[in-house]
Amino acid sequence: LTAFWESDRDKAVAFSRDIVERIRASKTASPAARLPDDRKLVMRLIEQAFSLADELQGGFGDQNKFPMSPQLHVLLKLQQREPSPGLHDFLVLTLDQMAGKGLRDQLAGGFFRYTIDPGWETPHYEKMLYNQAQLASLYLFAADVLNRPDYRVVAMDTLDFVLERMRGENGGYISSLSALDEAGVEGGSYLWSRERLASTLSEEELEVALAMWEFPFGTQLPGLALPFAREGESVDPELAEAVRLKLLAERAQRVPPRDTKQLAAWNGLLLKAFAQAAVAFNDEGYAEAAEALARWCLSMWDGRRLSRSNGQAGDASLADYLYVADGLRAWAEVSRQKQYSQTADELIARSWQLFFDDRGWRLGERQLIPGLDGEPAMQDGPMPAPSALAIALGTREQREKALRLGAEAVTGDPFWFASHAWQLFEHEQHAERTDGANEK
């Protein structure tokens, strides 16, 4: 590229402009004359989900397995609204696999980022704050929708792990724990050899450990194992907890490095999870954690601009504004403190000003490539599309405008736009209820 620029600058400029125009043309969307049929959209989303689903091992795809929290959350909402035996069974399978195998740390709690195999056995050992927040919320919701009280334990363990291991300074929570241990071995902080287990536990304790967890030696690294949950074994709870704590004490000697950045968006997701847990468990500890984190979120907002990261430069993105606003609003509903709902409203209004116009959504205030239009709708990624959250939190007029602009993209690929598809469905359902009430 450097040689091209230096040898023929005019041609390079023309070539760049042509690329920009092609990208712009591919993103250009006209507002739909009418919103799509919500029933057909839901059917298409579920069909697409099952076309990608692994119905033997749970999850989506046949190689790496990511939690895909946004899609699972929408599918749970659809299951709650209109129960389906097939969808129920798939959701239970997926959530059981995620909680019981290699994606989840069976000793300390918390989830790894993803697994590198389709059977949920070998994780990429990084632990991300956004995963902990979303999966705690997901399992709390799934416990009610699927009538699985044990999922509440998964949610609680996940949040307790965050409280113990991911607290940062000044009230926020850090971004991640490294996949590598201090010696540079991936998973070294979590894997066990037979020799290490035997030297850590007595014979009786080792029997308890092997009854509680499966140790598939050699499936991770030669001679090493990551413990999986073992079903159907009855172990004395006090003895089981003593063994777990003893293993954790040994593991504390191999603590993974921490990425201490405190990101507004991810902390906003966590604030919502704490607020939900404070209600679900009627727990003062989660309420105190939510209150402290809400105050930290307030400190990131100066009335016109939100800071992206505590103590570091950088413009906040649409995701930062919306996830923080959603977390503050969730805690305001629980705590009844007006300062949090007021700040949430300010963030929501500012996000629409900064990141949306007639051409669509922008993730940041500044485009990486000047001249490109915004996106009519944003796909879900590891986190829900912030544009869909903006629609959920916006005014009726804003929702209508944004939904019409993104309708074509969403209806063409609803699984990848699941959060947007849910907003379309909710909007149309609300309109039907309103029309029905008016007719009466």
Predicted regions and their residues:
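Glycine-rich cofactor-pocket loops
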Residues: 114-115, 278-281, 285-286, 302-312
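Acidic, serine/threonine/proline-rich low-complexity intrinsically disordered regions
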Residues: 82, 148, 276-288, 333-342
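Active-site-proximal alpha-helical segments within enzyme catalytic domains
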Residues: 135, 273, 324-327, 390
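Replace the tail clause
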Residues: 1-273, 277-280, 404-440
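Glycine-rich, acidic and aromatic/proline-enriched surface loops and short helix-turn segments
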Residues: 97-104, 292-300
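Long, polar/charge-rich, low-hydrophobicity segments
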Residues: 164-167, 299-322, 329-440
